[in-house]
Amino acid sequence: MPRTVGRSILALAALSISVAPASAQDARLAEQVDRWAELMNEQVIAWRRDIHANPELGMQEFRTAALVAEHLESLGIEVETGVGGTGVVGVLRGGRPGPVVALRADMDALPVTEQVDLPFASTATAMWQGREVGVMHACGHDNHVAILMGVASVLAEMRDDLPGTVKFLFQPAEEGPGGAEPMLADGAFEDPRPDAVFGLHAWPVPVGQILYRPGGQLAAADGLRIVVRGVQTHGSQPWSGVDPISAAAHIVVGLQTVVSRQIDLTDSPAVVTIGQIEGGNRGNIIPDSVVMVGTIRTLSPENRSRVHALIVQVAENIAESQGAVADVTIDLGYPVTANDPELTQQMAPSLRRVVGEGAIVMSPIMGAEDFSYFAEEVPGLFIMLGVTPPEDPSMGHPNHSPLFFADERALQIGVRALASLAVDYMSGRPISD
């Protein structure tokens, strides 16, 4: 995912800024969240370090899932394992009736060799695409799991006072092949069905910031493959064949006009990128075909459909104009991660209570996330948690980098944020502060 630049760096002292809850009952619950989050912080840090040192690729999160399940069971939470592969679902039923809230954390790591000098740095390896690779939590999922384990501890301590039910979703394979859909197909949203779902993601902006936006926050990501077919001939006689390389070059340029000239970028951004072109094996032979592979990113279902149609039209027409044929294949990936506008407005005061002015409405991100599938089922809110040391912005390396670093001071903020979202939603917190 590309880096998002936040607003000005906040002093850590600002983390104590709070907004008064809506009632005395809300105030008491908020105080309990903060107190238990502080008491649990050292344990959350220990979990995070353990998970970071023992990363596992998608659908191989056996150790992580076992750690999660054992912890949830120790809290007296109902636990189901093997959901959608290696997923874990926990259900905590509060002492008072109320809504059902789902909280989600993804568990998988990446095929990346860690370059961060930490005493708990990963030295793990695994087989990936037929070769041995290093494995690292280069996207912060170790933080996500530890935070949600901490939230489970906090809310379990508050069980008797909780006005509703909390469903904990520990999801496999967000980085691929995808774990949200298999979990849903395996009944993760059944018995009971959530009324809302919340999640967070570690992001390279300063600790003390939480970024969010109503509507499309992360893009849909679709695969693009175009095969341009021509007629092979000798390079000295191009007129006796059909050159697919020339056609492919024009298609690359033409695809950029889809975004720059045919889509209203002031309404909803879009990106079309060709990242791979293969064709021919000799410098003096015009090949019979060229293969182009790329990615399509859009931020609304309407633009997604429109961009797909325009890509097919542009590629086919340009190829035809040069006597070639273009076969276009679009593989649907994760849909848009869209925050429910009403839910976002309702819960914004909860975020401000945790980080004050550090709760920032952000610009969209053209990366993708399969939290989107959960948010298609019920209203959802996905937030970006700042994990870069405010005093050293140079540590803010992009997600998926072998240098990705997460400041552990963000963990307690993450626990407070997710727990507050759950408690405040169940309490029926009003829209205004």
Question: Which sequence ranges carry the predicted segments?
Answer:
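N-terminal secretory signal peptides that target proteins for export/translocation
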Residues: 1-5
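Acidic/His- and Gly-rich active-site-bordering loop/insert found
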Residues: 26-136, 143-163
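Soluble non-cytosolic domains of exported or imported proteins
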Residues: 38-42, 55-66, 142-146, 239-246, ...
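Divalent metal-coordination and catalytic microenvironments
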Residues: 51, 90, 103, 141, ...
